[in-house]
């Protein structure tokens, strides 16, 4: 191979390397520009703003047990509901409910907040019960203007229950003794290692009846 041929090959390789470096540089510049564009768009159109650019109906799915740490809770549920009420393009709200109930407190807070929001708007809000809308699930559903349910849906179950397990007899059989130091007559009211006293039973029954009566009163209003 002549020196000229070798020189041409070397020059060709050098040019290829330069082209590769230019391509990599351009790719990086393009990538940075793309990121800047995305960042700018996210600032000018934040996700918390009106996502929909035309009139629409918001569908809020409430599925599961109602509890402070459950899938239906005051924090996440009311955040979605408030966004729908505050969105001028949202004309109707549908609560898609599939819940056996849960916390009376969480249900009551959601129910009350929806009633407050309804006073300041002319939006229509409907509850659609799928498989189950019982107890607290029905409580929340009752905040709507209308409730829709299938003939096979489980709806209602207006009531209150307070549950507690008692391991005292089991521990006695195992020779295990529970020792607790407490102050206040009701501090051990639901202690799983103590029997409920008649006074405690009366107190809990009155509490359940009070919550139940409030539940019924809200549903009648």
Locate each region found by the language model:
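Small-residue-centered hinge/linker elements
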Residues: 1-124, 132-221
């Amino acid at each position: 191979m002549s020196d000229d041929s070798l020189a041409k090959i070397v020059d060709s390789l050098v040019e290829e390397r330069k082209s590769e470096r230019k391509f990599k540089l351009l790719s990086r510049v393009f990538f940075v520009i793309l990121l800047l564009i995305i960042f700018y768009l996210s600032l000018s159109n934040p996700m918390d703003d009106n996502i929909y650019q035309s009139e629409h109906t918001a569908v809020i799915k409430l599925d599961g047990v109602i509890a402070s740490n459950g899938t239906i809770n005051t924090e996440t549920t009311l955040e979605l509901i408030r966004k729908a009420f505050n969105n001028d393009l949202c004309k109707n709200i549908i609560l898609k409910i599939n819940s056996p109930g849960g916390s009376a407190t969480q249900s009551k807070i959601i129910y009350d907040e929806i009633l407050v929001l309804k006073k300041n708007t002319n939006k229509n809000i409907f509850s659609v019960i799928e498989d189950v809308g019982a107890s607290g699930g029905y409580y929340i559903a009752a905040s709507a203007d209308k409730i829709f349910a299938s003939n096979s849906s489980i709806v209602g179950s207006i009531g209150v229950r307070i549950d507690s397990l008692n391991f005292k007899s089991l521990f006695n059989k195992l020779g295990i003794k529970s020792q607790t130091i407490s102050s206040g007559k009701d501090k051990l009211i639901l202690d799983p290692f103590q029997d409920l006293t008649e006074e405690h039973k009366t107190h809990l029954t009155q509490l359940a009846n009070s919550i139940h009566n409030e539940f019924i009163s809200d549903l009648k209003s």
